[in-house]
Amino acid sequence: MATMMAMSSFAGAAVLPRGSARSLPALGRRTLVVRAQTEGPNAPPPNKPKASTSIWDAMAFSGPAPERINGRLAMVGFVTALAVEAGRGDGLLSQLGSGTGQAWFAYTVAMLSMASLVPLLQGESAEGRAGAIMNANAELWNGRFAMIGLVALAATEIITGTPFINV
C-alpha cells in the first residue's frame, strides 16, 4: 500500500506542467566556526589588584586623596564663607584674620582630612561608594568649582573692598 501511494505521487507529479512545479532551493555550504578558549566557561574572573593601603600612596601627587580632600574642604569652606557673609557681613579675608575663623579652619581641615583618609587606608577605592546621584566624578567637579568659588570670593573682596554679599 505504501508503495502504491509513493508511485501515485510520482505519477501525479509527472503530469503537472513544468512551470507550476516548485523546486527546493539548493543547499549551500554551511560553515562551521570554531573558537578556541584558554579558560573554561566557568573560570573565575582574574583577581583585581587591591588598592594600596599606604599613606604615601594615598597622598601621592596622582593619588586618590589630595584632590578629593582639597575639594571637600573647598566645598565646606565655600558654603560656610557665604553663610557667614550673609549672616554677619564679614568678608572672606576678615573671616580668615579672626582667631575664631582660624580655629574653625584648623579643626575642619583635621576632621575632614582624617575622615577622607580612613576609608582609603582600609583599601576602599574612591569610586567604591558611588550612588545614583553623587558619584566620584561629580564630587571632583564640585570640588573644583568650589575651589574656583573661594578664589572668586577672595578676588571680589580684594578688588571691590567689600564682601561678595553686601548686607
UniProtKB/Swiss-Prot annotation:
UniProt xrefs under InterPro entries: Chloroa_b-bind
Disulfide topology: none
Principal place of residence: plastid
Membrane-spanning intervals of the chain: 101-121, 145-165
Annotated localization: Plastid, Chloroplast membrane
Keyword Transit peptide annotated: yes
Membrane topology: Multi-pass membrane protein
Amino-acid biosynthesis is among the record's keywords: no
GO CC annotation terms, alphabetical: chloroplast membrane
Record-linked Pfam families: Chloroa_b-bind (PF00504)
Family of the protein in this entry: Belongs to the ELIP/psbS family.
Function: Probably involved in the integration of pigments into the mature pigment-protein complexes.
Name this protein carries in UniProt: Low molecular mass early light-inducible protein HV60, chloroplastic
